């Protein structure tokens, strides 16, 4: 009888494990490197490489705009991109809980394969383990990319730089929370690979000083971290922050601040003021960048400070997210 759920036998390393790998993962991620089924993948490469890893525990596994599979590819690909690297290879490790439906696992693997194709990366190695549980799933992905010979990071930020946000705040956070609270809304996660957007910047004459994708803790937290690393002050204009009316209403209903709400397909970019118009044009012309906006600038004020000029003309200091926030958002 064909099995329909994950059992402990699928983690034994025996016939059930082989059937699981061959029936789902090898089929979904099929490529010549993975097909060798050796203990490690040997891939071509030259020069400096970028390496990152991330783990994904999002609850629920499927949500409006994505699923844990798409998220696991986007998150790791975007981390490579934020250093200006060209993403190339991924590995993936799956922790499967007993009771997980095979059909759900197939959907997730297919989603990962489709997202990897969109991002231009190849899944070259993987692993599965099974634990007792209630039908859950956790994924770890590691990514390798090729550096492009440009130093990009928070330490490169300069006074006078302009801060560009690639799109609307808070959509992933709102999508996950609305699912958990059974709130009827059509807000969709912004989960997306930012390959086209970053490639457009990296192949242009724009000088990119820093990029950071906006995930847990939201824009406020990542800007605070970058301000502290750079030793500079970041000034934002609240009126310039892009937030959709639906997300703004959702925040008002639950008392949330869009600045602290996570995304999974947005980034903040710091460029010299002389390059801001061209950078903004390139981002808006790329996939997932239509709502990009200049939201602030960098100055040589108090080191590590992030200040928001409110809509009524006041000023408030921003700190990193304190406390739990929304657990298992990614």
Protein language model regions, located:
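Helix-biased detector of long, well-ordered alpha-helical tracts
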Residues: 1-330
């Amino acid at each position: 009888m064909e099995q329909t759920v994950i059992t402990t036998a699928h983690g034994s390393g025996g016939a059930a494990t082989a059937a699981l790998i061959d029936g789902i993962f090898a089929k979904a991620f099929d490529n010549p490197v993975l097909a060798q089924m050796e203990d490690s993948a040997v891939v071509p490469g030259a020069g400096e490489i970028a390496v990152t890893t991330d783990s994904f525990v999002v609850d629920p596994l499927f949500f409006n705009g994505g699923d844990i599979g798409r998220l696991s590819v986007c998150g790791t690909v975007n981390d490579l991109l934020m250093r200006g690297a060209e993403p190339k290879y991924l590995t993936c490790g799956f922790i499967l809980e007993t009771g997980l439906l095979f059909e759900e696992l197939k959907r997730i693997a297919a989603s990962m394969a489709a997202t990897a194709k969109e991002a231009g990366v190849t899944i070259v190695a993987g692993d599965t383990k099974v634990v007792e549980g209630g039908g859950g799933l956790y994924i770890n992905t590691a990514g390798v990319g090729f550096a492009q010979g440009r130093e990009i990071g928070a330490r490169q930020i300069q006074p006078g730089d302009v801060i560009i946000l690639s799109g609307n705040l808070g959509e992933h956070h709102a999508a996950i929370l609305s699912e958990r609270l059974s709130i009827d809304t059509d807000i969709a996660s912004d989960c997306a690979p930012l390959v086209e957007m970053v490639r457009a910047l990296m192949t242009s004459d724009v000088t990119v000083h820093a990029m950071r994708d906006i995930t847990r803790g939201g824009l406020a937290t990542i800007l605070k971290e970058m301000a502290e690393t750079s030793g500079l002050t970041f000034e934002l204009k609240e009126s310039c922050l892009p937030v959709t009316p639906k997300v703004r209403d959702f925040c008002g209903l639950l008392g949330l601040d869009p600045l602290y709400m996570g995304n999974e397909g947005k980034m903040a970019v710091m460029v010299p003021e002389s390059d801001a118009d061209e950078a903004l044009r390139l981002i808006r012309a790329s996939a997932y960048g239509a709502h990009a906006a200049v939201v602030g600038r960098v100055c040589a004020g108090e080191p590590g400070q992030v200040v928001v000029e409110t809509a009524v003309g006041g000023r408030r200091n921003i700190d990193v997210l304190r406390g739990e926030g929304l657990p298992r958002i990614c």
